UniProtKB/Swiss-Prot annotation:
Residues 18-235 form the Radical SAM core domain. Binds 1 [4Fe-4S] cluster. The cluster is coordinated with 3 cysteines and an exchangeable S-adenosyl-L-methionine. Pathway: Cofactor biosynthesis; pyrroloquinoline quinone biosynthesis. It comes from Rhizobium meliloti (strain 1021) (Ensifer meliloti). GO terms for molecular function: 4 iron, 4 sulfur cluster binding; cyclase activity; iron ion binding; oxidoreductase activity; S-adenosyl-L-methionine binding. Interacts with PqqD. The interaction is necessary for activity of PqqE. GO terms for biological process: pyrroloquinoline quinone biosynthetic process. Catalyzes the cross-linking of a glutamate residue and a tyrosine residue in the PqqA protein as part of the biosynthesis of pyrroloquinoline quinone (PQQ). Its EC number is 1.21.98.4. The gene is pqqE. Keywords: 4Fe-4S, Iron, Iron-sulfur, Metal-binding, Oxidoreductase, Plasmid, PQQ biosynthesis, S-adenosyl-L-methionine. Belongs to the radical SAM superfamily. PqqE family. This is PqqA peptide cyclase.
């Protein structure tokens, strides 16, 4: 695709007032025992020898706390692949950061879960790929993964750590959403996030087998609405719908450089998980610059803040403060221009072409899933 929207003339930019970030995603490692075909991590994974050390990560956490970060998400890859996970959790907790562990469950034991609880872990977010050993292990590419997840959920409950289930949904498992919600109830989770796959990183290679159909998306939306009513006050159900079938794009990350930031395993600081797919941007590293200077002053974080960068189609739109122009990485992937109107938007001149491509991708296919390799 190529964008046909005229760009605003190059003028001095006016940046909005920049507030401190509320949340930070710490990608502790890219190592992971699973081989999920929907993995959104980059094609080229960071190797273990390139990862930030224990001391470097604890220093980053201290900077984050000083910067004003409240929520720290410990992620990966699989964060349990880090031998120092308990130590890192304790360091973050001692700084007053709310800690959320985002995990596949593989690599955790009951003893380690208890150690994490003692270290001050506030919350655990457990991924599920399906509602049975057959579907979950097939999608995750890891035999025995489902049973391990069920054990981890039980250990979390025993340790009094609040639980969220994270269900990434796509064509292969979208018919299980109602059962996923029921599973969350049985596991006494407080929340479930039903999130449609985002086609970044490795997932881009599996579009033909993962793209849901329009009928699946409509059914999923109804299922979530009915479950929200049924379990109101019992289970929080967050829903990230398939934006390819929506009229308007999502407010990705709450707007570029507005709410949170990501730190990669090697220390690069990003406005969002997939930001490195934008080739025109260069991202600074916490090994060389402070988190504060990167957040407030770096060219990458300021690139899409405010409205001056927007094409006229977005700058003149009443939704510009609702979706902030949509996803910059999606614009890069679909339009070849990170400054373009997100092609998902019904007002984009590329929307009709995108709709046709999605219909073709969601058609029945015999293409096998391309499983993620391991770092």
């Amino acid at each position: 695709m190529s964008d046909t929207i005229a760009r605003p003339a190059e003028t001095a930019r006016t940046l909005p007032r920049i507030l401190p970030p509320m949340a930070m995603l710490a990608e502790l490692t890219h190592r992971c025992p699973l081989a999920c075909p929907y993995c959104s991590n980059p094609i080229a994974l960071t190797q273990a020898k390139e990862e930030l050390s224990t001391e470097e990560w604890t220093g980053v956490f201290a900077q984050a706390a000083d910067l004003g970060v409240l929520h720290l998400h410990l992620s990966g890859g699989e964060p349990a692949a880090r031998r120092d996970l308990v130590e890192l959790t304790q360091a973050a907790s001692s700084l007053g950061l709310y800690t959320n562990l985002i995990t596949s469950g593989v690599g955790l034991t009951e003893a380690r879960m208890n150690s994490l609880a003692d270290a001050g872990l506030d919350h655990i977010q457990l991924s599920i790929q399906g509602v049975s050993p057959e579907s979950a292990d097939r999608i995750g590419g890891y035999k025995g993964g489902y049973e391990r997840k069920m054990a981890v959920a039980g250990w979390a409950a025993d340790a009094a750590i609040p639980l969220t289930l994270n269900a990434v949904c796509h064509r292969q498992n979208m018919g299980e959403i109602d059962e996923m919600i029921e599973l969350a109830i049985r596991l006494k989770a407080r929340r479930i996030e039903v999130a449609t796959v985002q086609f970044h990183g490795w997932a881009e290679r599996n579009k033909e087998v993962l793209m849901p159909t329009r009928e699946q998306v409509e059914c999923a939306t109804r299922t979530v609405a009915e479950a929200r009513e049924k379990y109101q006050g019992i289970l929080v159900i967050d829903y990230v719908p398939a934006d390819y079938y929506s009229k308007y794009p999502k407010a990705c990350m709450g707007g570029w450089g507005r709410v949170g930031l990501n730190v990669t395993p090697s220390g690069r600081v990003l406005p969002c998980h997939a930001a490195e797919t934008i080739p025109s941007l260069s991202f600074e590293n916490v090994r060389e610059n402070s988190l504060s200077s990167i957040w407030y002053e770096s060219n990458a974080f300021n690139a899409y803040r405010g409205e001056d960068w927007m094409p006229e189609l977005c700058r003149s739109c009443e939704r510009k403060k609702v979706d902030f122009g949509g996803c910059r990485c999606q614009a890069m992937a679909l339009a070849g221009d990170a400054s373009a109107t997100d092609p998902v938007c019904i007002r984009s001149p590329l929307r009709d072409r995108l709709t046709l491509e999605v219909e073709q991708l969601s058609a029945p296919s015999v293409v096998p899933m391309n499983y993620r390799g391991r770092a």
